[in-house]
Structure formats: C-alpha cells, structure tokens
Amino acid sequence: MVSSAEAIVEHLRPVEKDPEVARPIAGELIDAVGADYDIVHGGFGGPTKFPNATLLDALLVKGDPTSLDMAQNTCEHLVRGGIFDQVGGGFHRYSTDSQWAVPHFEKMLYDNALLLATMARCWRRTADHDSDRRDLYSHAARRTVAWLNREMRLPNGLYAAGLDADSDDAAGHTHEGIYYLWNQDLITDALGTDEAEWLRPLVHLEPCNDNGLGTLQLRGRVEWERINADMDTLLEARGRRSAPARDEKAITAWNAMLIDGLVEAGMILREWSWVEQARELADSLWTAHWDDGMALRTSFHDRPGVPAVCEDYAWVALSFAGLAGATGESVWLDH
C-alpha cells in the first residue's frame, strides 16, 4: 500500500510545476483575443456575437489599460444595445449583428447569472469620475435581478432554465422576438404623445422585420429616473402580449451561478437584499436537489431528473464558499 502511494506521488510530481506556467499562458491567450476585438462596438468576432462573460471577467482581472478598455467598452455596448431587454431587463442569448442591435431573443439563466456578476465587476473597475458608464453597469445589474425575480423564479424557490425566443402576435401567428419589439406608434399608445416624443432621441428603434418593429437601444446620456419610469410603463403594456414559453427545468449549476452572481453583485453594489436572496436560493437548491450526499442535475416541477455532473458540484462548491464568506455562516462551507 505504501509503495503504491509513493508511486502515485512520484507520477503526479511533474504536475506540481504546471501552475508556474499557467499565468503567462493565460495572459498570452487573453492577448490573442485582442485580434478579434471590435474597437467600435465592443465584443469579439462577428457578425454573430456572444456576450462571453467569462472572457470579460478575465479582461477585468488582467487589469491593464487595454484589457480594461475592451471589457468596459463591450459592457457599455451590451447594455445600450438591443441584446439587453431595455423594457424588462435581462440579456438575450446573442446578437445576430456586430452592433448588438438585433439579438436571438432567447433568454438563458446562465447567461444572465454570469453577466450579473460581470456588470458589477465592471462597475468596480471603472473610475468614479466615469459616472455615466458606472450607471449603465449598475442599471443592467438591477434590471436583470428584477427580471429574474419577476419572470424566472419557480414556486419551489429555484430559477427556470430560460425563456423561448418565439411567441404569438395578436393574430396568433408565431414569430421570433415579437414579444420584445416596438414601433413608434406602439410606444406612443403606451406613453402618450409628449412622453414618446421626449423618449424618441434617447431610445433608438432598430427595425428587425418588414413591419417596422424593432428593438430599443439607449442613446446619449441617460436620465435614469425618467427613462426607467417609461420602461416600466412599456413593460406594463407588453404584459398584455402573448409571452414566450418558459423552460420550467431547474438546473443545479445554473442556479449556483445565480447564487454566485447575486453574492458578487450584492457585495459590490451594496445591494444586501441580493445576498439574502442568494442565501434563500442556496437553501432551496440544497433542499430540492440534494439527498444523502448526492446531487441532482435537474428537476422539473419538483420531479427529480438526471444525476449531477462535475459542473454542478463545481459551481455549488464555488457559490456556497462565496456565500459563506459574505454571510459568515459556516453551514455553507459544511455543505
């Protein structure tokens, strides 16, 4: 037994040197990404663009001026663009164009959980004097949390996997994104003529179909209190439309990502209720998806699904450790 253990140790010994080269390799990989950076609209590659929260986080951690500029510029264009649901909050799946104007309209829990933390980190790494950008990032985080709580929370306290891209128009015909699209007449009907005219130069309409319906995009300096009030009015009007279907499946890793995002963003932006929300979600996740040391990957309407995989255990461990640090409750470390 001892000789076997010694043999294993000797076999693994070369691996101990790997961390020494990990940092420069990671830096080189991040530098290489710059070749695909869109200096005008932010993001990487194209014309189809994904937000890529993990890459943005890596740029924020790297922290040199070039990396920070790429992350901040990308986050600003994400929040101003049609890929962000200006009316209801939350990010769509990806953009079909280089300007983040016309998204694929599906909304996923994991994208929004990760981007919630990214927006808060970007806020933290942006100078105090750049208040316009900081306000954009914190606005995106707050509207995203509001959307998650309004539309994604399941009766058992967990969060649904996503929202479909398609829904029906007034005539019962199915279209992608129709639930989220506007034209000037629809905005005027909801807000009234005077308010719609005030909003017109600040919120650009990007047509997505032959009917002139389009996504909303923020322009110029934002008067947040008034625009948020207008968006809330539009949200109420939109609530009378046929909504996209919700994927009612609860996925362990994705809910754990949200725990991590709520803790991180709550601590950074001093939204302490988000940390409490993360604690409640962790409690629900532990109750619903854990049994005698084994975890579920999924559940559907409280019916257990398949067993957990490595991703689920990793994200639960990470998020529970962060929650323990934020709350001082050792029970999350025990879990």
Task: Describe these PLM feature segments.
Residues 253-256, 261-333:
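Long, K/E/R/D-enriched contiguous segments that form extended
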